[in-house]
Amino acid sequence: PYDEKKGLRFHKDNILLDPYARAVTGQRHWGERPEGGKDFVYHARVVENNFDWEKSCFLNHPFEDLVIYEMHVRGFTRDASSGVKAPGTFEGLREKIPYLKDLGINAVELMPIFEFDEMEDTRVVDGERLYNYWGYNTVCFFAPNTSYTSVVEHNHEGDELKNLIYELKENGIEVILDVVFNHTAEGNEKGPCFSFKGIDNNIYYMLTPDGYYYNFSGCGNVMNCNHPIVRKFIIDCLRYWVINYRVDGFRFDLASILSRDQNGAPMENPPILQGL
């Protein structure tokens, strides 16, 4: 039963998104709300996993030799000066690989590319609509962001990202993902309930005794990373991106959250860090 004071937020009429979904119906075009308007509901999609990696493998550059270029997928090519055919997309970034190679870098760190909703911020400043530009508010951890794809058709975002990673590796460039496991896009008690909250709010988030959300992340909620179920979810996610997308490494946003127990206290030996 629904009981906010006990941290129970599931409602029988609320459609929930599978946290393990490999693809999500989302923003086909950046800044445009799909059919459903403000009441749009995220749905999982079935995807094919038939990308041919040929002989692509992990480059294993020595850590001390890495020259890392941190970038935002959309921001890197969105301006016309980038000269690409598909600006602001995975494909647009692939077009710029010769430029990256000329710089002499041997790794790129992609700022968040997991599914997020740039339309969640409804504020207006000086007459301009604000967007969740950076992507640090994850909707689905196993799914590439749909608005970063250049072709509007189902399942293309995964193959387009894999093609980018394949071409980067062919040019000696490793791929590191910026991952955000400290909080999610569901926010605090005033935020939406579309996934973890409805599945088991008490397990996935750190809650106060009266059912409110601890906010050590500064983003409304905190993932309960050292609970066995959440810990398994995180490790499953990282393993998925390594196996299926051949990702070389990860940068953990606000990694100190990974060291906290369910009440927010720092742990001497956090299980999630030991697992990683």
What feature does the model see in each segment?
Residues 72-92, 98-246, 254-272, 276:
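Substrate-binding/active-site clefts of carbohydrate-active enzymes
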Residues 251:
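Conserved, function-defining core regions and hallmark residues within catalytic/recognition domains
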Residues 1-70, 77-85:
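The feature marks proteins involved in alpha-glucan
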